[in-house]
Amino acid sequence: MSEEKNSEVGGYHAKIALSLLVLVYIFNFIDRQILSILAEDIKADLGISNSDIGFLFGTAFGVFYSVVGIPMGKLADSWNRKNLISIGLAFWSLMTFLSGTAKSFLSLSIYRFGVGIGESSASPSAYSLLSDYFSPKVRATVLSIYSSGLYIGAGIGLFLGGAILDTWNSAYPDYTQAPFGLKGWQAAFMGVGLPGILLSIITFFFIKEPVRGLSEGIVTEPSKEPFKDTFKEFIGLTPISLLSEKESLKSIGINALMGFIIFVLCFALYNLTGDFLQWTAWGIGTYLVSTWIQSLSKRDVVAFMLMFKGKAAIYSFIAFPCIPFVGYAYSAFTPSFYINNHGMSALEIGTLIGLITAIGSFIGVIGGGYFGDKLRERYVGGRLYVIFAGGVLITLVGCFGMIYAESKNISLIFNFIYHIGSSVYVGCAATTVTNLVLPRMRAMAGAFFILTLSMIGLAL
């Protein structure tokens, strides 16, 4: 079967790809979210604080996920996206498994860096691949279906983590009697890491690479030197990329000024919070990204103009991350909130919160994409109306209701409402960003979009 027929818009291979990519995203968030349900045991075992857990859940993961996502996006724009997704899935699953061998805060941090690097390959590639497989008219719905894996994975991660943790700790109160001397939280990391490696083999053989730009009739030839292009994108994150410019001295001066401003900001935030690791990592990540934007303006003028000169793109990159800014913090500390305020066990939280997260968010993300596409047929800003209604109004009601409700059951109901609202924006936001750029730069734009979500939502 020819590649053209394999990549028929909305056809058989498109549906297979969408189904498998949902599974990939489920594993993406199982491996990411499981840390929150294991947090209390990890804190006790490794002797670390809430700030350290916040660093592991947010900054350690978020900075690497965000920054490495840019060259990964470039690789997805110039190489085989199916291969990149499969390799990335195998790598982050291995890093999750190795997290179960961690004996210190440092080693666990390194493995979380690895998870972030591996996962950075997934969504930019998936956004680009699915945009070629399906018509722009249903793009928000398709990307919402893909993004539902995020919430299903988060829910399953809580459930599996809690179940493995409680079962293991009950079976082996003395961990020295457990297989390989593993503790419950270590067994949980290993238990969710292995299946992802198996899934990577399936995605490699069953997802077909579509013709780039086919769904819009803007067929783009693949790059002849994809790895060289990606290496240039890596170099673009550093000031070295500015030395080859005609006005290199001026560029270096501007770059140094940006670096100084970022340093002053991070130093002030460190003095305010006392969290050296978080603001050091965030500052380095922000500096690398600002350097990349500066170098992109010289290396790829068209991409720079579409991503950073158009008002729609700028507003998108600033506004959309404000929703996960609340959401990631909410998700990271929800288990601890119910343990400390409502006396719930890890297994109870894993079951109830896991189901609430999975079901509520699935309803929100699919509904958001569907109604976004329908409203877009009638109003130019239809998808944005959906984002505001769900991502702002419903989210605020659910968040404050959960925190201030005195009854556990009422709090859980508001938690459900929160997850419906907070997931509405995902497909509509991703579609808005991918529609603003050309097919050849879709993955890179998607990577920068995810970067803004992560650097503002996760790392902050």
Residue ranges: model-predicted function:
Residues 35-36, 248-281, 311-358, 365, ...:
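Extracytoplasmic gate region of multi-pass secondary transporters
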Residues 38-67:
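Extracellular/periplasmic helix-loop-helix junction of adjacent transmembrane segments
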Residues 47, 80, 101-107, 118, ...:
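Helix-breaking motifs and short loop linkers at transmembrane-helix boundaries and internal kinks
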Residues 56-74, 127, 355-368:
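Central cavity-lining transmembrane alpha-helices of secondary-active solute carriers
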Residues 67-106:
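Conserved MFS/SLC helix-loop-helix module at the cytosolic interface between two early adjacent transmembrane helices
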Residues 78-89, 373-390:
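Cytoplasmic membrane-interface "Motif A"-like loop-to-helix N-cap segments
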Residues 183-205, 278-285, 395:
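Symmetry-related core transmembrane helices of the 12-TM Major Facilitator Superfamily/SLC fold
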Residues 380-429:
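C-terminal transmembrane helical hairpin of 12-TM major facilitator-type secondary transporters
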